[in-house]
C-alpha cells in the first residue's frame, strides 16, 4: 500500500492522495542539496562503480525514461550468471561493455552491448577456495566490481582482490589479504581512489579483527592498512585525529574500552560502502559490529567498532570518528551507505554526510568535523529512545538490553537494523532521499560463546518477526532537512535491493518476491513493475547504450542474509537459523525460488 505524508508512521494505513501530490511543489520551494562537483562528475551515460560516483548518490541524469513512458519498458536482453545464489552485485557499463560479477565463485563476465542480445565477450574465473563457502556469514554474495584506469577490480569470497584487464579479461594481479581458516572473507565492492584500491574484510561473526586496506592499483601491493581495534598506531590514529565528541578522545581507546585482549577478536569489520571527497581528500567508511554479539562479554564502548571513520585517502590516517552504537547491543554494523552532499543547514553552508543507519536513524553529519547535526528515526524503535546531539551518544532503552540466558522480547529494529547494506539513492532533481529498508523486530537471548578460530563467535539466539503493521519492508522518501518521511510504500518482505534515482523522476528498486518496480519520485506511485524469475537483492543501474538509448539493469537471484532460507535451503522449522531471519521469512519459499539472471530493460 502507498502511504502519504499525512498517515501515522507504522500506524493505521491511510492515504491522503491530495497531500502526497502536493509534495513536488513543497520540495521545489526548498534549495536542493548537491553533491560535491568533484565527487559527482557530469553524466556520461556510463556506470563505472556500484555507487555511481564518489558521493554515493546513485543518481543518474539520464531522463529518456520518465514518468510518462516508463510504463512501456520491455526486456532488451537477459543473461544467466550460472550461479543460483544471492545476487547482490551492481552491473557496470563502461563504454560499450557491461560487466557482471557473480556470487561465489565470483566469475566476471563481459557482455558486448554493440551486438543484439549482448553476447558474451569473455569471462574470468578467479577460482576461489571452495572452503570459503563454509565460513561466509550470510550467503556467498558479492556487492560488485568497480572500473578504473582500464581495469576491473573486485574481491573474492576467499579474501583475494583481483585486477583484470577490462578489454581482454586477462588477470593483471591477484592479492591474498585474508585467511579463511580464521573466518576472514571478502564480499564488498572496492573503491578506487587515485592509484589506490581500497577494500575491507568480512567475518565479524567469526571473531576476526576488522581492517581497511589500500592496495596499489597497478601492482596489488599494500600501501596502508588500518585496523578497527587495538592500539592507536594500528588504527592509524595520530596527531591529526580530531574527533568531535569527548568520548572518542584519549589514547589507545581501541584497547582500554575492551576487556583485556578482547579487542584481538573484536570485529569492526569493513564490508560495506566507502565514499570519497576529492576536495578534502578524505574517504569515509563504516565499521561493523563488535564481537561477539553478546555485549555482556565485552563491557566498554568497544572502540572503534560500530562507527564512521574519516581518513586521509593517501595515508589512511584517521581524521575523525563517530560511534553510532557504543557498546553495540544488537549487532548494528555501521557499514551502510555514506552519501556526501553540500547543502545549507540552519542558514549556513555545510559539507555533510547522510547515513541511513542500522540503528534506525537517518544521520546528517558534518563530514569535515564529525559533528552530528541531526538523527531522526525512519524505523519503528523500542531498543533506543533517541540520539543526544550534545554528546553524540545513542540512548539505549534499558528494558531492551540483552541479558544472559533470558529472552528479551520485542526489540526494534533487529540485528539486521532499520536497514542493512542495501543502498539508498538521492535525487538532485527532487532533493529527496529514497530508502529501501525493513520493518522488523526481534526476540533476543544472549548466551556465552567461546572463541575458536574459524568458527562462529556470536553468543545470541535471535528470532525476527514483522514490525508494526504486519509488513516487513518499506520503500520511503525522506526529507533530509526536515528529518521526516514524505511517503512510504509497504512491502510484504524486507527490502534487500538497492535503489537508483533518475532525472526522469523515476526511482527503481526490487523486492524479495521478485518484482522490479519503477515509482514516481515525487509521489511514490508505482508506474511499472516486472516479475523476474527470483527474488531481487541486487543493485539497479541505468546507462546510455551505444544506440543512444537509456537502459535499466538489475540482477535477480534471492539470497543474502534475509533470503538464506531459499538460497541456502534452510529448514523453516528452525526460527533461529540464518541468525534469526528464518523465523520471519518462512513464507518466502512459497513465493520465489533460487535464481541468477540479469535483466536489462529499454523503451520500445
Where in this protein do the model-derived segments appear?
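N-terminal cofactor/phosphate-binding cores enriched in small/glycine residues
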Residues: 60-178, 502
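Beta-propeller blade signature
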Residues: 169, 210-221, 301-316, 366-370, ...
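Extracytoplasmic beta-rich repeat domains
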Residues: 79-90, 123-146, 174-189, 227-273, ...
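N-terminal pre-domain segments of enzymes
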Residues: 28-63, 588-592
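Repeat-blade elements of multi-bladed beta-propeller folds
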Residues: 47-51, 86-107, 134-161, 185-206, ...
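Bacterial N-terminal signal peptides
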Residues: 11-25
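Repeat-solenoid scaffold signature
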Residues: 185-221, 328-390, 400-412, 416-421, ...
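Short, conserved, GDST-rich strand-edge loop motifs in beta-rich repeat architectures
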Residues: 199-211, 257-259, 285-302, 408, ...
Amino acid at each position: 500500500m502507498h502511504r502519504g505524508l499525512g498517515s501515522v508512521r507504522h500506524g493505521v494505513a491511510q492515504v491522503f492522495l491530495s497531500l502526497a501530490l502536493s509534495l513536488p511543489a513543497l520540495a521545489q520551494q526548498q534549495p536542493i542539496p548537491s553533491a560535491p562537483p568533484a565527487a559527482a562528475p557530469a553524466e556520461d551515460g556510463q556506470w563505472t562503480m556500484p555507487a555511481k560516483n564518489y558521493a554515493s548518490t546513485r543518481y543518474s541524469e539520464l531522463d529518456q525514461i520518465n514518468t510518462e513512458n516508463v510504463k512501456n519498458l520491455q526486456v532488451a536482453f537477459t543473461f544467466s550468471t550460472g550461479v543460483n545464489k544471492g545476487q547482490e552485485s551492481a552491473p557496470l557499463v563502461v563504454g560499450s561493455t557491461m560487466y557482471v560479477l557473480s556470487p561465489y565463485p565470483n566469475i566476471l563476465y563481459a557482455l558486448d552491448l554493440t551486438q543484439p542480445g549482448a553476447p558474451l565477450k569473455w569471462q574470468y574465473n578467479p577460482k576461489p577456495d571452495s572452503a570459503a563457502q563454509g565460513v561466509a556469514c550470510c550467503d556467498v554474495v558479492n556487492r560488485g566490481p568497480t572500473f578504473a584506469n582500464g581495469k576491473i577490480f573486485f574481491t573474492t569470497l576467499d579474501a583475494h582482490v583481483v585486477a583484470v584487464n577490462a578489454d581482454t579479461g586477462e588477470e593483471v594481479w591477484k592479492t591474498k589479504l585474508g585467511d579463511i581458516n580464521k573466518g576472514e572473507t571478502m564480499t564488498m565492492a572496492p573503491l578506487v581512489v587515485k592509484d589506490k584500491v581500497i577494500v575491507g574484510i568480512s567475518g565479524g561473526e567469526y571473531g576476526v579483527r576488522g581492517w581497511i586496506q589500500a592496495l596499489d592499483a597497478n601492482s596489488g601491493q599494500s600501501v596502508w592498512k588500518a585496523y578497527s581495534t587495538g592500539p592507536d598506531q594500528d588504527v592509524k590514529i595520530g596527531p591529526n585525529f580530531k574527533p568531535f565528541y569527548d568520548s572518542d578522545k584519549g589514547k589507545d581507546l581501541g584497547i582500554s574500552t575492551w576487556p583485556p585482549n578482547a579487542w584481538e577478536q573484536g570485529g569492526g569489520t569493513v564490508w560495506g560502502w566507502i565514499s570519497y571527497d576529492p576536495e578534502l581528500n578524505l574517504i569515509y567508511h563504516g565499521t561493523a559490529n563488535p564481537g561477539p554479539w553478546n555485549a555482556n562479554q565485552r563491557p566498554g564502548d568497544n572502540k572503534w567498532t560500530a562507527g564512521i571513520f574519516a581518513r586521509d585517502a593517501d595515508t589512511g590516517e584517521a581524521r575523525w570518528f563517530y560511534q553510532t552504537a557504543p557498546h553495540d547491543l544488537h549487532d548494528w554494523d555501521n557499514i551502510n551507505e555514506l552519501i556526501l552532499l553540500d547543502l545549507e543547514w540552519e542558514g549556513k553552508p555545510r559539507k555533510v554526510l547522510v547515513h541511513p543507519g542500522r540503528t534506525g536513524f537517518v544521520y546528517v553529519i558534518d563530514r569535515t568535523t564529525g559533528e552530528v547535526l541531526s538523527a531522526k528515526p525512519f524505523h519503528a524503535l523500542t531498543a533506543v529512545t533517541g540520539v543526544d546531539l550534545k554528546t553524540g551518544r545513542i540512548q539505549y532503552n534499558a528494558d531492551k538490553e540483552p541479558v544472559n540466558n533470558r529472552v528479551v522480547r520485542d526489540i526494534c529494529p533487529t540485528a539486521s537494523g532499520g536497514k542493512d547494506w542495501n543502498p539508498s539513492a538521492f535525487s538532485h532533481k527532487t532533493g529527496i532521499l529514497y530508502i529501501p529498508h525493513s520493518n522488523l523486530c526481534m526476540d533476543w537471548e544472549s548466551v556465552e560463546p567461546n572463541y575458536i578460530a574459524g568458527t562462529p563467535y556470536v553468543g545470541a539466539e535471535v528470532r525476527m518477526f514483522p514490525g508494526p503493521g504486519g509488513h516487513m519492508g518499506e520503500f520511503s522518501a525522506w526529507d533530509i532537512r526536515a528529518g521526516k518521511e514524505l511517503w512510504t510504500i509497504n512491502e510484504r518482505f524486507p527490502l534487500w535491493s538497492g535503489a537508483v534515482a533518475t532525472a526522469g523522476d523515476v526511482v527503481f528498486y526490487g523486492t524479495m518476491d521478485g518484482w522490479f518496480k519503477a515509482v514516481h519520485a515525487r509521489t511514490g506511485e508505482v508506474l511499472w513493475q516486472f516479475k523476474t524469475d527470483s527474488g531481487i537483492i541486487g543493485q539497479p543501474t541505468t546507462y546510455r547504450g551505444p544506440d543512444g538509448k537509456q537502459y535499466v539493469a538489475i540482477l535477480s537471484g534471492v539470497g543474502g542474509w534475509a533470503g538464506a532460507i531459499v538460497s541456502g535451503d534452510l529448514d523453516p522449522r528452525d526460527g533461529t537459523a540464518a541468525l534469526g531471519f528464518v523465523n520471519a521469512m518462512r513464507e518466502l519459499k512459497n513465493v520465489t525460488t533460487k535464481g541468477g539472471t540479469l535483466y536489462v530493460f529499454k523503451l520500445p
